[in-house]
């Protein structure tokens, strides 16, 4: 599996894109910065998008993608997957014909650009040879991470935004995860804010990793605040985990 890091930042600044991870050029996990980075041809290859939660930095590009499709020559369709509360928020507060046109009924309800599909935590769905399972994670709004397995039984887990989530690690125990992409947003000195907003710090990450057995082969950090990137990197390096590193926009992960 090839995962292209379209964006992995915890805040938007020049050179720092909101979260979006593209699997083998065709399946997207979160959609924070899709349309501002990929050209039209690459955008139109994406038919399925899995959303971890409904915060704006994870869904922002979906409206612009729908708009690019409807005005283009290739009238492709895109399916948006997530748990019920996330789908409901996207439908009610985004595609409501007030904030943005309702592309779930455009050009007509029977042939719409967007199809919203609800998932249940712990239940798998098969897409293009991949098995995808959502697992609940701890965040300030309903949120999930995704366990993804290919035909060769290679697996990665993408946490999305998450604070300490011991129940999640119990549920994916013994899955032999080859790659973990996990949120570390703040330096350890900001632990109180991290816990209040349901994110991780390097110290909290260390505690979480102690709960994951077996430990994933490689661990990638996503969602760091650009203002604290150097501090977070220094603290991550001090943990002495040989297989942990912070992602940057444009990175390619091969699982």
Sequence positions of predicted segments:
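Conserved beta-strand hairpin/beta-sheet module of binuclear metal-dependent hydrolase folds
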Residues: 1-42, 144-160
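Divalent metal-coordination and catalytic microenvironments
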Residues: 3, 21, 29-30, 53, ...
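Active-site neighborhood of phospho(di)ester-bond hydrolases with catalytic His/Asp-centered motifs
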Residues: 29-32, 47-57, 81-83, 157-162, ...
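Active-site metal-binding motif and surrounding structural segment of the metallo-beta-lactamase
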Residues: 35-82, 178
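Short amphipathic alpha-helix with an adjacent loop that forms part of the alpha/beta core around
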Residues: 38-43, 64, 125-128, 169-174, ...
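Short, surface-exposed connector motifs at secondary-structure boundaries
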Residues: 75, 152-154, 213-219
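Metallo-beta-lactamase
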Residues: 85-143, 151, 242-254
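Cap/insert and terminal regions of metallo-dependent hydrolase folds
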Residues: 164-254
């Amino acid at each position: 599996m090839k995962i292209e890091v379209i964006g992995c930042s915890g805040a938007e600044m020049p050179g720092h894109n909101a979260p979006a991870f593209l699997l083998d050029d065709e399946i997207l996990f979160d959609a924070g910065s899709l349309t501002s980075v990929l050209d039209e041809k690459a955008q139109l290859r994406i038919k399925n998008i899995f959303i971890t939660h409904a915060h704006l930095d994870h869904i922002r590009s979906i409206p612009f993608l729908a708009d690019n499709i409807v005005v283009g020559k290739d009238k492709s369709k895109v399916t948006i997957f997530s748990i019920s509360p996330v789908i409901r928020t996207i439908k009610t507060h985004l595609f409501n014909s007030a904030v943005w046109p309702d592309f779930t009924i455009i050009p007509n309800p029977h042939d719409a650009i967007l199809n919203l599909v609800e998932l249940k935590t712990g239940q798998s769905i098969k897409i293009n040879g991949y098995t995808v399972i959502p697992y609940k994670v701890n965040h300030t709004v309903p949120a999930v991470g995704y366990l993804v397995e290919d035909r060769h039984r290679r697996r990665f887990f993408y946490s999305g935004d998450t604070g300490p989530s011991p129940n999640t690690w119990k549920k994916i125990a013994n899955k032999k995860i080859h790659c973990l992409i996990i949120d570390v947003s703040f330096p350890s000195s900001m632990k109180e804010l991290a816990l209040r907003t349901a994110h991780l710090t390097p110290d909290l990450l260390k505690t979480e990793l102690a709960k994951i057995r077996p430990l994933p082969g490689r661990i990638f950090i996503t969602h760091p605040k650009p203002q604290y990137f150097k501090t977070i990197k220094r603290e991550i390096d001090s943990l002495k985990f040989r297989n942990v590193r912070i992602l940057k926009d444009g990175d390619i992960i091969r699982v």
